[in-house]
Amino acid sequence: RDDCGAGAPLTGDVRRAMNDLLDKLNDEQRAVVECTEGPVVVFAGAGTGKTRAVTYRIAYLLANGVAPERILAVTFTNKAAGEMKSRVAALVPGRGERVWMSTFHSFCAKFLRLEHAAAGLPASYVIYDDADQKQVIRSVMKDLMLHEKDLSIETVREMISRAKDGLVDAESYRINSCVYKDDANRETVAEIYLRYQQRLDAAHALDFGDLIMRAVGALRSDDALRRRWADRFR
């Protein structure tokens, strides 16, 4: 909770409206909404009401005096993030718009803009999209005299992306490629990955996988930074 005006509890009318909303939830959804202490992770299948439960929880927190700037909600897709934003704004007009709601990648991009120095990045770093990634990979493969008919650029991009999704950097991937022979292309991709990453670093560029890797790396390596951001969201 916050003692400032931004975190003051909402009116009785809004509270009554929240009770009406709670009556529409099943027991599992209601348990998510009414849990007001600490973080909550919601796992469920498609169409089971995950977004509803999360958005109602945000509205419930606001109704109980939590300042919107101290609430963070992240999801995997732009569609889900957009639904969260529109639903919360409709439930709590004027305050719902100030809640941090985004995809994981979007949140990490914002975090890195704010904490670029802690992440070892210049303030002017750029983000490469899929087309940019493929262009760099194509250039690296040309330098290595590798042909697309033997190893497609998309295959390389996907393998690098999977590695980054697992928080495996280029050097670790190269070392592991010498041990695990689970893919005939792994050692070749390891060399491409290494050179690809060197070119991104030289251009002060991040791809989508880097957004999460660099954010996680900064938080893991800096206790003060981690505590500050942990305290930011309640």
Regions flagged by a language model, labelled:
Residues 22-36:
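N-terminal pre-P-loop "Q-motif" helix
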